[in-house]
Amino acid sequence: MDNLKKIRKNNKLTHQDMAEKLKISKAFYWQIENGKRRLSYLMAVKIAKIFNKKPDEIFYEEHKNKD
């Protein structure tokens, strides 16, 4: 989820900011960003909307670059 962290920081948002926008706890968001919790498709869509992106632009690019 390095791409997510990079995008979040580039937009000057904190873990707390993201948690509030997503209506989840800060700890839950931290777990998502750090790969400790599985990311549902619905949550990926919600996160992508915050940055006006498609989920693939944030999450799929990491896997694509590893191939």
Question: What does each model-found stretch correspond to?
Answer:
Residues E33, M43, F51:
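DNA major-groove recognition helix of helix-turn-helix
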Residues L4, H15, K26, Y41-A44:
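Helix-turn-helix DNA-binding elements, focusing on the entry/boundary residues of the two helices
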Residues I7, K21-L22, I32, E61:
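Residues in the recognition helix of alpha-helical DNA-binding motifs
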Residues D2-K21:
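Short basic helix-loop element that most often maps to the first helix and adjoining turn
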Residues I24-R37:
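Recognition helix of helix-turn-helix/homeodomain-like DNA-binding domains
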Residues D17, F28, E57:
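Residues in the helix-turn-helix
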Residues I7-K12, L42, K49, E57-D67:
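Short, charged recognition helix plus adjacent turn
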